[in-house]
């Protein structure tokens, strides 16, 4: 049976990376028991940042679609919604942003319009990094065996934030002018010299 050489299996150099751990640069470690109890932040070592303040353009957009949702929505002809058991999937930061801010819009047509307008707002959004942190934590949460919450519910639970699904409060002056626009009345306008 002769002379058998034992060959060593080696890993090619392009698949090896070297790194060094510096004790002064270690992130403070969080107690893993606390993470297991709360199950809010998955593998994060620090807490999530607070919900960012919406920009003026975003506030105007949400106000417009919130009012349209309350005023023009006609639910006739719709089938009763079935509680579909959807599989929770990892998301990106724009999807998180869009789903959070469009959660109260129930009209499908308005949701489609709002989605494209939110995409325009997203390009100018200064808090994209905050939304990226939210999605990273949410995607880690999805790795847990008992993950059952969608992104909006998970974020609200993680930030101890309660959702107010009522119409946003506006000043009486702007509300009356908005109602006049929607009332269908036509006023005559005369130019006087």
Swiss-Prot record:
GO terms for cellular component: nucleus. The keyword Glycosyltransferase does not apply. Its main location: nucleus. Residues 86-142 bind DNA. GO terms for molecular function: DNA binding, bending; DNA-binding transcription factor activity; sequence-specific DNA binding. GO terms for biological process: positive regulation of mating-type specific transcription, DNA-templated. Induction: Induced by HBR1 in response to hemoglobin and growth signals. The keyword S-adenosyl-L-methionine does not apply. It is found in: Nucleus. Belongs to the MATALPHA1 family. The C.albicans mating-type-like (MTL) locus contains, in addition to the genes for the regulatory proteins (MTLA1, MTLA2, MTLALPHA1 and MTLALPHA2), a and alpha idiomorphs of a phosphatidylinositol kinase (PIKA and PIKALPHA), a poly(A) polymerase (PAPA and PAPALPHA) and an oxysterol binding protein-like protein (OBPA and OBPALPHA). MTLALPHA1 is not represented in the genomic sequence of strain SC5314 because that haploid assembly includes the mating type a allele of this locus. Most C.albicans strains are heterozygous at the MTL locus and do not readily undergo white-opaque switching and mating, but mating occurs in hemi- or homozygous strains. Mating takes place in opaque cells, produces tetraploid progeny and seems to occur rarely, if at all, in nature. Conservation of mating capacity is rather thought to be due to the simultaneously regulated white-opaque switch, which seems to play an important role in host commensalism. Mating type proteins are sequence specific DNA-binding proteins that act as master switches in yeast differentiation by controlling gene expression in a cell type-specific fashion. Transcriptional activator that induces the transcription of alpha-specific mating genes. This is Mating-type-like protein ALPHA1. It comes from Candida albicans (strain SC5314 / ATCC MYA-2876) (Yeast). The lineage of its organism: Eukaryota, Fungi, Dikarya, Ascomycota, Saccharomycotina.
């Amino acid at each position: 049976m002769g002379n058998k050489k034992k060959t060593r299996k080696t890993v090619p150099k392009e698949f090896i990376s070297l790194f060094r751990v510096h004790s002064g640069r270690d992130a403070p470690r969080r107690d893993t028991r606390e993470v297991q109890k709360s199950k809010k932040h998955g593998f994060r070592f620090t807490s999530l940042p607070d919900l960012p303040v919406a920009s003026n353009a975003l506030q105007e957009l949400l106000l417009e679609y919130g009012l349209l949702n309350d005023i023009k929505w006609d639910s006739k002809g719709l089938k009763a919604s079935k509680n579909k058991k959807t599989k929770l999937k990892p998301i990106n930061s724009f999807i998180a942003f869009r789903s959070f801010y469009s959660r109260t819009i129930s009209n499908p047509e308005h949701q489609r319009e709002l989605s494209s307008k939110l995409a325009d707002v997203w390009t100018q959004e200064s808090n994209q990094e905050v939304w990226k942190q939210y999605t990273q934590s949410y995607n880690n949460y999805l790795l847990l065996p008992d993950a059952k919450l969608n992104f909006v519910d998970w974020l609200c639970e993680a930030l101890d934030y309660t959702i107010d699904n009522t119409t946003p409060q506006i000043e009486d002056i702007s509300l009356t002018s908005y109602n006049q626009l929607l009332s269908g009345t036509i006023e005559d306008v005369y130019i006087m010299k």
